[in-house]
C-alpha cells in the first residue's frame, strides 16, 4: 500500500482524533457521541483505527509499519513501546519535533531535498534512524536556513491556534535545539510520555499479531 496523499482533514475526521504529524489543522468537533460510537465498533475495527493513527501520523506505508512491528518484536522490551521509539527516532519525525517543519510530510521534504545534516553529513533518507549522541543541523545555505526560519516562526503560531499541538510547545526532553545556529542533538531514546500522538500501541501490536 502506498503512502497516503489524499485530503488530510478527511483522515482526522474519520479517526476522530488529532494527528499533528499529518496536518496542523485542528480536528472539527464531531456531534457523534464517541462512547456510543466505540460500542458499535468491533474489536477488529478498534485495532485497525489505532493502527491507522500511527500510519497516518508518521506518514508511512502499510509495508513500512509492518516492518517496524517485526523489528520491535525482535528487540528487548515491550513490543509496543519499542515500536513507538522506532517511529519517533526517524529523522523526518525528529525534524518535525524540533519545530523545523510544520508536519512530518514537510519534514520529509526538507530531508529529501538535502537540507539536513547528521553528524555534518547530508542525509536525504527520511527513515534514517537517529541515535543518542548524534548531531542534527541545517546546511549552511541561505535557502535551507530561510525555509527552517519560516517553519520555526509558523510553528509558534500554529501552537497558539491549535490546542491539539500543545505537546509541541517545547522540544521534548530527548532532543535539544539551538535555533540561532540551526543545530540540534539527540540526548537519549524517546520515552513513552514524549510520544507525539495519542495511540494505544498494544492494540496496534494485537492487530499485527497474525502478520508479524
UniProtKB/Swiss-Prot annotation:
It is found in: Plastid, Chloroplast. This is Small ribosomal subunit protein uS4c. Keywords: Chloroplast, Plastid, Ribonucleoprotein, Ribosomal protein, RNA-binding, rRNA-binding. Belongs to the universal ribosomal protein uS4 family. It comes from the Eukaryota. GO terms for cellular component: chloroplast; small ribosomal subunit. It holds the Pfam family Ribosomal_S4. Part of the 30S ribosomal subunit. Contacts protein S5. The interaction surface between S4 and S5 is involved in control of translational fidelity. The keyword Chloroplast applies. GO terms for biological process: ribosomal small subunit biogenesis; translation. The gene is rps4. Residues 89-152 form the S4 RNA-binding domain. PROSITE patterns: RIBOSOMAL_S4 (PS00632), S4 (PS50889). The keyword Ribosomal protein applies. Transmembrane segments: none annotated. GO terms for molecular function: rRNA binding; structural constituent of ribosome. CDD domains: S4. One of the primary rRNA binding proteins, it binds directly to 16S rRNA where it nucleates assembly of the body of the 30S subunit. Disulfide bonds: none annotated.
